[in-house]
Amino acid sequence: MTPRPRRDQERTGGGDGIGRSRAGPGREVWAARLLTFSAGAVNALGFLALGGVFTSVVTANSALVGIGVGHADAAPAVLAGLAVLGYVLGAASGGWAAARVRRARRAAAADFLLLELLLLWAVAAWWLRLDGHPGGWVRTTLLVLLSAAMGCQNAGVLVALGARAPTAYLTGLLTHAVTDAVTEGRLRWRAPATVGLLVAGAAGLALLERWLHGVAAVAPAVLVTGAWLLWRTDGAAPHAPAAGRAGRERGTAG
Protein backbone atom coordinates (compact mmCIF):
# COMPACT_ATOMS: atom_id res chain seq x y z
CA MET A 1 0.00 0.00 0.00
CA THR A 2 1.51 3.33 -1.07
CA PRO A 3 1.89 5.79 1.83
CA ARG A 4 -0.06 8.99 1.49
CA PRO A 5 1.90 12.15 0.73
CA ARG A 6 2.90 14.20 3.74
CA ARG A 7 0.72 17.06 2.58
CA ASP A 8 -2.33 14.81 2.63
CA GLN A 9 -1.43 13.51 6.08
CA GLU A 10 -1.10 17.03 7.43
CA ARG A 11 -4.50 17.96 6.05
CA THR A 12 -6.39 14.90 7.31
CA GLY A 13 -4.47 14.12 10.47
CA GLY A 14 -2.54 11.15 9.04
CA GLY A 15 -5.24 8.73 10.16
CA ASP A 16 -4.35 9.26 13.81
CA GLY A 17 -6.49 12.22 14.76
CA ILE A 18 -9.37 14.40 13.78
CA GLY A 19 -9.21 17.66 11.94
CA ARG A 20 -5.52 18.28 12.60
CA SER A 21 -3.54 20.81 10.66
CA ARG A 22 -0.30 22.72 10.95
CA ALA A 23 -2.17 25.18 13.13
CA GLY A 24 -2.79 22.43 15.70
CA PRO A 25 -6.00 20.85 16.95
CA GLY A 26 -9.22 22.70 16.21
CA ARG A 27 -12.38 23.05 18.22
CA GLU A 28 -13.67 19.76 16.85
CA VAL A 29 -10.72 18.01 18.49
CA TRP A 30 -11.33 19.71 21.82
CA ALA A 31 -15.01 18.82 21.56
CA ALA A 32 -14.11 15.14 21.14
CA ARG A 33 -11.82 15.36 24.16
CA LEU A 34 -14.60 16.89 26.24
CA LEU A 35 -16.92 14.09 25.16
CA THR A 36 -14.37 11.50 26.28
CA PHE A 37 -13.97 13.26 29.63
CA SER A 38 -17.75 13.36 30.01
CA ALA A 39 -18.01 9.65 29.20
CA GLY A 40 -15.71 8.87 32.12
CA ALA A 41 -17.89 11.04 34.35
CA VAL A 42 -21.13 9.37 33.23
CA ASN A 43 -19.74 5.87 33.77
CA ALA A 44 -18.50 6.85 37.23
CA LEU A 45 -21.90 8.28 38.14
CA GLY A 46 -23.66 5.11 37.06
CA PHE A 47 -21.26 2.89 38.97
CA LEU A 48 -21.08 4.93 42.18
CA ALA A 49 -24.64 6.17 42.56
CA LEU A 50 -26.96 4.13 40.35
CA GLY A 51 -26.42 0.52 41.27
CA GLY A 52 -22.81 -0.41 40.48
CA VAL A 53 -23.40 -0.72 36.74
CA PHE A 54 -21.52 1.01 33.93
CA THR A 55 -23.37 3.09 31.37
CA SER A 56 -21.34 2.42 28.22
CA VAL A 57 -19.30 -0.73 28.91
CA VAL A 58 -21.52 -3.28 27.21
CA THR A 59 -19.00 -6.11 27.66
CA ALA A 60 -18.89 -5.71 31.45
CA ASN A 61 -22.64 -5.24 31.75
CA SER A 62 -23.33 -8.33 29.65
CA ALA A 63 -21.01 -10.29 31.93
CA LEU A 64 -22.91 -8.95 34.95
CA VAL A 65 -26.13 -10.27 33.43
CA GLY A 66 -24.53 -13.70 33.12
CA ILE A 67 -23.16 -13.57 36.66
CA GLY A 68 -26.58 -12.65 38.01
CA VAL A 69 -28.16 -15.54 36.14
CA GLY A 70 -25.47 -17.95 37.34
CA HIS A 71 -25.92 -16.86 40.95
CA ALA A 72 -29.72 -16.85 40.65
CA ASP A 73 -29.63 -13.19 41.68
CA ALA A 74 -32.11 -11.31 39.53
CA ALA A 75 -31.44 -7.77 40.77
CA PRO A 76 -27.95 -7.17 39.27
CA ALA A 77 -28.85 -9.10 36.13
CA VAL A 78 -31.95 -6.98 35.52
CA LEU A 79 -30.11 -3.74 36.26
CA ALA A 80 -27.22 -4.55 33.92
CA GLY A 81 -29.62 -5.83 31.27
CA LEU A 82 -31.62 -2.60 31.38
CA ALA A 83 -28.39 -0.61 31.04
CA VAL A 84 -27.51 -2.59 27.91
CA LEU A 85 -31.02 -2.09 26.54
CA GLY A 86 -30.83 1.65 27.19
CA TYR A 87 -27.46 1.79 25.46
CA VAL A 88 -28.78 -0.05 22.40
CA LEU A 89 -31.82 2.20 22.11
CA GLY A 90 -29.63 5.27 22.55
CA ALA A 91 -27.19 4.05 19.92
CA ALA A 92 -30.02 3.51 17.46
CA SER A 93 -31.41 6.98 18.14
CA GLY A 94 -28.01 8.69 18.08
CA GLY A 95 -26.95 7.00 14.86
CA TRP A 96 -30.24 7.91 13.21
CA ALA A 97 -30.01 11.52 14.39
CA ALA A 98 -26.39 11.89 13.23
CA ALA A 99 -27.25 10.46 9.81
CA ARG A 100 -30.13 12.92 9.42
CA VAL A 101 -27.93 15.82 10.50
CA ARG A 102 -25.27 14.77 8.01
CA ARG A 103 -27.82 14.76 5.18
CA ALA A 104 -29.27 18.15 6.16
CA ARG A 105 -26.88 20.68 4.67
CA ARG A 106 -28.22 23.54 6.78
CA ALA A 107 -27.69 21.70 10.06
CA ALA A 108 -24.46 21.79 12.05
CA ALA A 109 -22.69 18.44 12.34
CA ALA A 110 -22.70 18.67 16.12
CA ASP A 111 -26.48 18.85 16.39
CA PHE A 112 -26.82 15.09 16.86
CA LEU A 113 -25.56 15.81 20.39
CA LEU A 114 -28.84 17.58 21.18
CA LEU A 115 -30.48 14.21 21.80
CA GLU A 116 -27.77 13.25 24.29
CA LEU A 117 -28.06 16.67 25.92
CA LEU A 118 -31.81 16.22 26.35
CA LEU A 119 -31.19 12.97 28.23
CA LEU A 120 -28.33 14.31 30.35
CA TRP A 121 -30.16 17.47 31.39
CA ALA A 122 -33.27 15.42 32.23
CA VAL A 123 -31.12 13.26 34.52
CA ALA A 124 -29.49 16.36 36.04
CA ALA A 125 -32.85 18.00 36.76
CA TRP A 126 -34.27 14.82 38.29
CA TRP A 127 -31.11 14.37 40.37
CA LEU A 128 -31.28 17.94 41.69
CA ARG A 129 -34.94 17.56 42.55
CA LEU A 130 -34.11 14.51 44.67
CA ASP A 131 -30.97 16.11 46.16
CA GLY A 132 -28.86 13.35 44.66
CA HIS A 133 -30.61 10.47 46.42
CA PRO A 134 -32.75 8.56 43.91
CA GLY A 135 -34.08 5.19 44.90
CA GLY A 136 -36.07 2.30 43.54
CA TRP A 137 -37.47 2.67 40.05
CA VAL A 138 -36.23 6.27 39.81
CA ARG A 139 -32.63 5.16 40.24
CA THR A 140 -33.11 2.48 37.59
CA THR A 141 -34.69 4.99 35.22
CA LEU A 142 -31.79 7.40 35.64
CA LEU A 143 -29.34 4.58 34.88
CA VAL A 144 -31.22 3.68 31.69
CA LEU A 145 -31.31 7.34 30.61
CA LEU A 146 -27.56 7.72 31.16
CA SER A 147 -26.88 4.49 29.26
CA ALA A 148 -29.03 5.77 26.41
CA ALA A 149 -27.06 9.03 26.45
CA MET A 150 -23.80 7.10 26.08
CA GLY A 151 -25.26 5.07 23.23
CA CYS A 152 -26.28 8.31 21.54
CA GLN A 153 -22.78 9.70 21.91
CA ASN A 154 -20.91 6.64 20.67
CA ALA A 155 -23.13 5.98 17.66
CA GLY A 156 -23.43 9.65 16.78
CA VAL A 157 -19.69 10.20 16.86
CA LEU A 158 -19.16 7.04 14.79
CA VAL A 159 -21.52 8.33 12.08
CA ALA A 160 -20.22 11.90 12.20
CA LEU A 161 -16.49 11.20 12.47
CA GLY A 162 -16.11 7.54 11.59
CA ALA A 163 -13.35 5.59 13.35
CA ARG A 164 -11.24 8.68 13.89
CA ALA A 165 -12.61 9.85 17.22
CA PRO A 166 -14.03 7.24 19.58
CA THR A 167 -15.03 8.95 22.80
CA ALA A 168 -16.27 6.13 25.04
CA TYR A 169 -15.64 3.15 22.77
CA LEU A 170 -12.01 2.57 23.65
CA THR A 171 -11.36 -1.18 23.67
CA GLY A 172 -10.78 -1.26 19.92
CA LEU A 173 -8.74 1.95 19.97
CA LEU A 174 -6.37 0.59 22.61
CA THR A 175 -6.19 -2.84 20.97
CA HIS A 176 -5.20 -1.35 17.62
CA ALA A 177 -2.62 0.89 19.31
CA VAL A 178 -0.99 -2.08 21.05
CA THR A 179 -1.13 -4.17 17.87
CA ASP A 180 0.50 -1.40 15.84
CA ALA A 181 3.19 -1.01 18.49
CA VAL A 182 4.21 -4.68 18.49
CA THR A 183 3.75 -5.43 14.77
CA GLU A 184 4.84 -2.19 13.13
CA GLY A 185 6.94 -0.54 15.82
CA ARG A 186 4.65 2.47 15.71
CA LEU A 187 3.29 3.92 18.95
CA ARG A 188 0.08 5.94 18.67
CA TRP A 189 0.05 8.23 21.68
CA ARG A 190 -3.52 9.27 20.99
CA ALA A 191 -4.86 5.95 22.32
CA PRO A 192 -3.39 6.11 25.85
CA ALA A 193 -4.10 9.85 25.93
CA THR A 194 -7.77 9.18 25.17
CA VAL A 195 -7.94 6.49 27.85
CA GLY A 196 -6.31 8.94 30.25
CA LEU A 197 -9.03 11.50 29.53
CA LEU A 198 -11.72 8.97 30.36
CA VAL A 199 -9.93 8.02 33.59
CA ALA A 200 -9.61 11.70 34.51
CA GLY A 201 -13.32 12.25 33.87
CA ALA A 202 -14.21 9.32 36.13
CA ALA A 203 -11.86 10.56 38.85
CA GLY A 204 -13.28 14.07 38.67
CA LEU A 205 -16.85 12.83 38.98
CA ALA A 206 -15.89 10.55 41.87
CA LEU A 207 -14.51 13.55 43.75
CA LEU A 208 -17.58 15.60 42.93
CA GLU A 209 -19.88 12.77 44.00
CA ARG A 210 -18.02 12.56 47.28
CA TRP A 211 -17.85 16.25 48.16
CA LEU A 212 -20.78 17.80 46.26
CA HIS A 213 -23.07 14.83 45.85
CA GLY A 214 -26.20 16.87 45.32
CA VAL A 215 -24.94 18.41 42.07
CA ALA A 216 -22.81 15.55 40.72
CA ALA A 217 -25.19 14.69 37.86
CA VAL A 218 -24.98 18.23 36.49
CA ALA A 219 -21.31 17.86 35.51
CA PRO A 220 -21.78 15.48 32.52
CA ALA A 221 -24.53 17.69 31.10
CA VAL A 222 -22.33 20.77 31.38
CA LEU A 223 -19.39 18.98 29.74
CA VAL A 224 -21.40 17.75 26.76
CA THR A 225 -23.00 21.19 26.39
CA GLY A 226 -19.51 22.64 26.16
CA ALA A 227 -18.53 20.04 23.57
CA TRP A 228 -21.61 20.83 21.50
CA LEU A 229 -20.88 24.57 21.59
CA LEU A 230 -17.23 24.05 20.64
CA TRP A 231 -18.06 21.70 17.79
CA ARG A 232 -20.92 23.82 16.50
CA THR A 233 -18.84 26.98 16.33
CA ASP A 234 -16.16 25.06 14.45
CA GLY A 235 -18.56 24.59 11.53
CA ALA A 236 -19.67 21.38 9.91
CA ALA A 237 -17.46 18.41 10.71
CA PRO A 238 -15.87 16.59 7.76
CA HIS A 239 -17.72 13.45 6.77
CA ALA A 240 -15.85 10.16 6.82
CA PRO A 241 -18.01 7.37 5.41
CA ALA A 242 -14.94 5.24 4.66
CA ALA A 243 -13.65 5.68 8.20
CA GLY A 244 -17.10 4.86 9.52
CA ARG A 245 -17.11 1.58 7.60
CA ALA A 246 -13.63 0.78 8.91
CA GLY A 247 -14.74 1.41 12.48
CA ARG A 248 -17.78 -0.83 12.10
CA GLU A 249 -15.71 -3.59 10.50
CA ARG A 250 -13.39 -3.64 13.52
CA GLY A 251 -16.28 -4.84 15.67
CA THR A 252 -14.65 -3.93 18.97
CA ALA A 253 -16.35 -4.26 22.33
CA GLY A 254 -16.71 -1.24 24.58
What are these regions (language model features)?
Residues T2-P238, A243-G254:
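Alpha-helical transmembrane segments of multi-pass membrane proteins
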